[in-house]
């Protein structure tokens, strides 16, 4: 007797079915989906991000009415080094999705402030931290760093020390800007992140003496 082998495709999970339906009905504004760590991820072309978010917000089956966050991710080895990531929430349907588009240092992504006004400060932060441009933003300027700040701190190639230090000069009675000067080098080379540094601190010898007398 031969075993009967089923040729039916395995049933999709609710998230997989949602991703499949979103891509199928998006008219090309969203091109791919995947499920990772229990979350639905969507991918689309950057030049159609406004259409994609409008579709997700207004479609009666999805109703993603809240843009929870917008941020960037830097992959310097890629030609289009930046992911722009949009986190959406549907309170009505109890769904969350993450929509990603890719861009480079010179190509602006359309601003989504006409769709979600809350994106105003989110896009300014992504511009400030990553140097991602947003075409059509009403006021695209830095929001976290100081005036005249050089570079974008969350890029992978930005030095950890920065370029300029800001301090208050008591003699001049004003804030001054100076190039960063590394006056001390510390090598933190621990065998385990749970092991503390073995520094000799004042008073340590007393503790060692008491331990020896015990």
UniProtKB/Swiss-Prot annotation:
Stated name of the protein: NADH-quinone oxidoreductase subunit C
NCBIfam families: NuoC_fam (TIGR01961), PRK06074.1-1 (NF004730), PRK06074.1-5 (NF004733)
GO molecular function annotations of the record: NADH dehydrogenase (ubiquinone) activity; NADH:ubiquinone reductase (non-electrogenic) activity; quinone binding
A Pfam match: Complex1_30kDa
Keyword Phosphoprotein appears in the UniProt entry: no
Disulfide bonds: none
Catalytic activity reported: a quinone + NADH + 5 H(+)(in) = a quinol + NAD(+) + 4 H(+)(out)
PANTHER family: NADH DEHYDROGENASE [UBIQUINONE] IRON-SULFUR PROTEIN 3, MITOCHONDRIAL (PTHR10884:SF14), NADH DEHYDROGENASE UBIQUINONE IRON-SULFUR PROTEIN 3 (PTHR10884)
Family affiliation: Belongs to the complex I 30 kDa subunit family.
Known role: NDH-1 shuttles electrons from NADH, via FMN and iron-sulfur (Fe-S) centers, to quinones in the respiratory chain. The immediate electron acceptor for the enzyme in this species is believed to be ubiquinone. Couples the redox reaction to proton translocation (for every two electrons transferred, four hydrogen ions are translocated across the cytoplasmic membrane), and thus conserves the redox energy in a proton gradient.
Gene Ontology annotations for the cellular component aspect, listed alphabetically: plasma membrane
InterPro entries: NADH_DH_suC, NADH_quin_OxRdtase_su_C/D-like, NADH_UbQ_OxRdtase_30kDa_su, NADH_UbQ_OxRdtase_CS
EC top class, as a word: translocase
Major place of residence: membrane
Lineage top rank: taxon: Bacteria
Subunit-level organization: NDH-1 is composed of 14 different subunits. Subunits NuoB, C, D, E, F, and G constitute the peripheral sector of the complex.
EC number: 7.1.1.-
Compartments, as annotated in UniProt: Cell inner membrane
Membrane association type: Peripheral membrane protein
UniProt keyword annotations, A-Z: Cell inner membrane, Cell membrane, Membrane, NAD, Quinone, Translocase, Transport, Ubiquinone
Keyword Protein biosynthesis among record annotations: no
């Amino acid at each position: 007797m031969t075993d009967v082998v089923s040729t039916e495709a395995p049933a999709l999970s609710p998230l997989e079915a949602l991703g499949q339906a979103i891509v199928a009905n998006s008219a090309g504004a969203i091109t791919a989906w995947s499920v990772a760590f229990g979350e639905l991820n969507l991918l689309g072309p950057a030049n159609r991000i406004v259409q994609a978010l409008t579709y997700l917000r207004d479609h009666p089956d999805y109703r993603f009415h809240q843009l929870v966050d917008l941020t960037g991710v830097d992959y310097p080895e890629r030609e289009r080094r930046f992911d722009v990531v949009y986190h959406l929430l549907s309170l009505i349907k109890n769904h969350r999705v993450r929509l990603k588009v890719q861009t480079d240092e010179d190509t602006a992504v359309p601003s989504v402030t006409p769709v979600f006004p809350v994106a105003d400060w989110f896009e300014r932060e992504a511009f400030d931290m990553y140097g991602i441009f947003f075409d059509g933003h009403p006021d695209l300027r830095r929001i976290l760093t100081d005036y005249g700040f050089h570079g974008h701190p969350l890029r992978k190639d930005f030095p950890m020390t920065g370029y300029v230090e800001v301090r208050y000069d008591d003699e001049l009675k004003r804030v001054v800007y100076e190039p960063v000067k590394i006056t001390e080098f510390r090598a933190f080379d621990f065998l385990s992140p749970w092991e503390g540094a073995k520094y000799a601190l004042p008073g340590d010898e007393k503790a060692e003496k008491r331990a020896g007398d015990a």
